[in-house]
Amino acid sequence: MRVFNFSAGPAAMPEEVLRQAADEMLDWHGSGMSVMEMSHRGKEFMSIHEAALTDLRDLLGVPASHRILFLQGGGIAENAIVPMNLLGARKTADFVVTGSWSQKSFGEAKKFCTPHLAASGKTEAGFTRAPARAEWQLSDDPAYVHLCTNETIDGVETFEIPDLGDVPLVADVSSHILSRPMDVAKYGVLFGGAQKNIGMAGVTVVIVREDLLDRALSICPSAFEWKTVAANNSLYNTPPTYAIYIAGLVFQWLKRQGGLEAIEARNIEKSKLLYDTIDASSFYLNKVEPAARSRMNVPFFLADETRNEDFLAGAKARGLLQLKGHKSVGGMRASIYNAVPLEGVKALVEYMKDFEQRGA
């Protein structure tokens, strides 16, 4: 029996994609091979690779000025790879810290430069807001400005993306990429791990403006130097072939759903239903300011936290899984990525209401 999976990542996958991958597991398109057995330079995999790149460019509207790269290491590795590729001769990078992940990025950058805290969304209640551009205090000559546009742990999403002129904006989009349209031209670099909205863990997507490819530090490993990866069409070393294949299937699925405009409408409906339920209750609490609430990751707390384990056990009995909040913040968290259907959110909301009534 399939359950409703609210995991923050690796996360729920579209069932159509899972079924297609199962059907093609032993024999991809009459090749007699599984995708995971193919040479990454053979014509069969090359067709998969090129289709994935093309479909992602189409979905996001990536302009010709930007290159799409498939790497490995996830978002965590990019926290080191970004400064190694962008610092050049500069010694400072600016950070807007809106949650746990941008805080990690800030800390990792200390190994390569002197990071400057341009703004913070931290309050007495934790990370609960996305600072407006007017609050950002940029340094005199930063190599770039880093922003995590959706904080998976804290449930903070930044919707207003400013124009920073000549300063490249770097965004960690791991947990909301492909959930809504984006103006890619505003960014110098976008990066994200795949295991939330793109596909399975193993491949990392980097979208980088071409004029930024000449800034790498000499210490940057060649396998992670964007210029080298771009020059080799993401095939400098053996790529995560099966993860790229799965990502390609997800891109095709997104196109069949009507593209990102249609997906955004679904995500608004799902998140609104869940937040409205929380706000109408005196038993559940979300601490994030309404304007910064994530559509993908919804943390919430029970008024009586001694009942947390009962809540999780009851949810599991109804086929509602992986609702436990991150260990650093506690409580609950429902990650409602693209592949989580509206029916799953409705089932969760119904359970939340029942649980509250039983405890009243």
UniProtKB/Swiss-Prot annotation:
Cofactor: pyridoxal 5'-phosphate
Pfam families registered for this protein in UniProt: Aminotran_5
Cell compartments where the protein resides: Cytoplasm
Binding site residues for pyridoxal 5'-phosphate: 101, 152, 172, 195, 237-238
Swiss-Prot/TrEMBL GO biological process terms: L-serine biosynthetic process; pyridoxine biosynthetic process
GO MF: O-phospho-L-serine:2-oxoglutarate aminotransferase activity; pyridoxal phosphate binding
Residues that, per the record, bind L-glutamate: 41
Cofactor binding note from Swiss-Prot or TrEMBL: Binds 1 pyridoxal phosphate per subunit.
GO CC entries: cytoplasm
Catalysed reactions listed for this entry: O-phospho-L-serine + 2-oxoglutarate = 3-phosphooxypyruvate + L-glutamate; 4-(phosphooxy)-L-threonine + 2-oxoglutarate = (R)-3-hydroxy-2-oxo-4-phosphooxybutanoate + L-glutamate
Pathway entry: Amino-acid biosynthesis; L-serine biosynthesis; L-serine from 3-phospho-D-glycerate: step 2/3; Cofactor biosynthesis; pyridoxine 5'-phosphate biosynthesis; pyridoxine 5'-phosphate from D-erythrose 4-phosphate: step 3/5
Sorted UniProt keywords: Amino-acid biosynthesis, Aminotransferase, Cytoplasm, Pyridoxal phosphate, Pyridoxine biosynthesis, Serine biosynthesis, Transferase
Protein's job: Catalyzes the reversible conversion of 3-phosphohydroxypyruvate to phosphoserine and of 3-hydroxy-2-oxo-4-phosphonooxybutanoate to phosphohydroxythreonine.
Family as reported in the entry's similarity comment: Belongs to the class-V pyridoxal-phosphate-dependent aminotransferase family. SerC subfamily.
Protein name: Phosphoserine aminotransferase
Species this protein is from: Burkholderia orbicola (strain MC0-3)
